[in-house]
Amino acid sequence: MKREGHRRSRWPGFFIFLAIMALIGLLVWLLPVFRLNSIEVPELRSLDSQPVIDASGLVIGRHLFRGLGGNLDQMAHLRYPQVEAKLLAAFPTIKSVRASLKFPGKISLAIEERVEVAYVSFPDGCVMIDKEGVALKIWQDEPQDIPIIEGVSATSLVLGKPLEVDVPSAMNSAITLMGAIIEADKDSRAAIRLLPQIRTIRPLTGSRLYLTVILPRTGEELTVLSETGQDQTEDMLWLRFALAQGSFDGRGKGVLDLTGSRKTFTPD
């Protein structure tokens, strides 16, 4: 009899527990603090915030727990993997995105954009690529502030994917060079950036490339011979400083050779 009475005494506590849990669930569902009331988008370089919000599928009033989770890492950081996937699919210029919950009532979109650093021309226009060779945009007019990669032709073009060309080794050499230029431009000591001064990149056989560089002070053209390798970033940094100091101003046309142990300028 005592055992039966003990069993019966457990039931009220169990029902109270269920009632409390149901009440908590109801509060979580109904309270405004668990509803989306703002979407945080950082200042973007090439995208407008409203199209990004529209493509995300997020709407004000949506419950914050809807779509939350995914794998363990995404759950631990309160992320929305479906929102991230939608944005990556909608915008080829987005390199990475993190959609995460921020109490109260906010979802933050942290977006890293790809930056166009060169382009490849084709009969109807050109395609701009980033430093990894990913196709970003198709334009009819050739841009003036980034270089053209000559000697390669696109064979397959899918925005958001690496551009496929007829000479992959040449494209790889150009991509390596662009990476070295971007690294050199991170140095804060020189007064000018190198990338905007480069008009053409033409890979040769092997690891060598020709660059056409515009001298910033005079507007003259300088042909530069470079070579992919561990010293290429240092070579590009040296070239950047030389341009800033006007080292080749007024010397006429010629070729600056950066491939040997000594940097030499040979007039035409």
Describe each model-derived feature in a short phrase.
Residues 1-40, 50, 55, 63-66, ...:
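Charged, solvent-exposed interaction patches on well-folded alpha/beta domains
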Residues 44-47:
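Short glycine-enriched loops at secondary-structure junctions
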